[in-house]
Design a protein with these regions (language model features):
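Bacterial N-terminal signal peptides
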Residues: 4-15
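Eukaryotic scaffold repeat domains enriched in small/polar residues
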Residues: 19-364
Length: 364
């Protein structure tokens, strides 16, 4: 009898701990009409958003489009003050502008942008002048110039060159880590002077392999967090590329959740395990951001069901907010997150052509 009771207790205990704990809903507000645009200026898809030490907001938009529908040039970098008032455009008609991807601000308030179309990373100083250039776009006069062609298998990666580059981040020593990107499926590391140091990664789904490393961030210890979007995970490495761990975000989805665009993904368990590209799977990280020290947390966004997740750096989900949609406090494919503090974040949305400034209620 005693043995039976012990077995029953152990079984019940195992059952309890096997259940997913409820993730708290984070309460938040979106500042209405945050960005004040001049009458003749319009945003396109907002691919990037960043905030500097003065709380100035930088928006990397696929506005100012020129050229044909396919292969158009679509990139415009704009600066706003802390209250959202327009200040200036940076890099008007810049040679590297092709298809905006992300913008970041380093600890010295330099601006860094990645352009997926030109395969280039550009560093601007605080005055908005070009300070450093990485990569090179194809020459318009080359007979073989064909930016929309994807050779199969892809051509081997080349040091110092990128293919559809996605994001940048830095360590305390000033080394830059570049996620490269849709085709090369690797992380590159360059020193503070721009010298190429190393790269790691290749296409695949094993540790240290990537399916679109789409966003990148570093913590205060110098660990590198890579949003491996197509594999629905965040991989964590040391500064030399040694794999440390991976994080997956598994929060139940409301059966009534709607996609921001397109068909609703089929999440039926009867379909078997998800295979192949998981970009639209719940929890797949499109953008990640780590708050400043000393108490660092990470934010991650997905395309469906359009949520933002707040996590510890070891991957515990602390809370969740948002859903897909077109109204304030709803999201249409968050492509980049800026998180200057734990309870103030900025999101750039592709489908809604906007930036939202979100004020989160502190945890109790």
């Amino acid at each position: 009898m005693r043995s039976s009771l012990i077995l029953f207790f152990l079984s019940a205990t195992s059952f309890l701990f096997a259940q997913p704990s409820r993730v708290p809903e984070i309460q938040y507000q979106s500042v209405p009409d945050f960005l004040k645009l001049p009458p003749d200026l319009y945003l396109g898809e907002v691919a990037g958003v960043a905030v500097n030490s003065k709380r100035h907001v930088f928006v990397f938009s696929r506005g100012n489009s020129t050229g044909p529908a396919y292969g158009a040039s679509a990139a415009q970098l704009l600066e706003f003050d802390a209250d959202g008032r327009f200040l200036r455009e940076i890099g008007h008609n810049l040679y590297a502008w092709s298809f905006a991807h992300t913008v970041k601000v380093d600890k010295e308030d330099n601006l860094w942008v990645t352009d997926k179309g030109s395969d280039m990373v550009i560093k601007f100083n605080r005055e908005g002048r070009v300070a450093m250039v990485f990569g090179r776009k194809q020459e318009a006069s080359d007979e073989g110039t064909a930016p929309l062609k994807h050779p199969k298998p892809p051509l081997p990666p080349v040091d110092g060159m990128f293919r559809q580059v996605t994001d940048v981040a830095w360590d305390a020593a000033g080394n830059t880590y570049i996620s490269d990107g849709y085709i090369n499926s690797r992380i590159a590391k360059v020193d503070k002077n721009g010298n190429w140091l190393k790269s790691w990664g290749e296409a695949g789904d094993q540790p240290g392999q990537f399916s679109t490393p789409h966003s990148i961030a570093l913590d205060a210890a110098g660990n590198v967090y890579v949003a491996d979007r197509g594999n629905r995970r965040i991989q964590v490495f040391d500064g030399d590329g040694k794999f440390l761990r991976q994080i997956t975000i598994d929060v139940p989805v409301d059966p009534n959740a709607r996609p921001a665009i397109g068909n609703k993904p089929n999440l039926s368990a009867s379909d078997g395990p998800v295979t192949g590209n998981q970009t639209m799977a719940p929890g797949a990280p499109w953008a990640i951001c780590i708050t400043p020290p000393p108490n660092q947390v990470m934010y991650s966004s997905d395309g469906y069901p359009g949520r933002i997740y707040k996590l510890t750096l070891d991957g515990k989900v602390l809370g969740v907010l948002g859903e897909s949609g077109k109204q304030l406090k709803q999201f249409g494919w968050i492509h980049e997150i800026a998180c200057p503090s734990e309870n103030e974040i900025y999101v750039g949305e592709l489908l809604n052509w906007r930036v939202q400034k979100l004020i989160l209620e502190p945890s109790h």
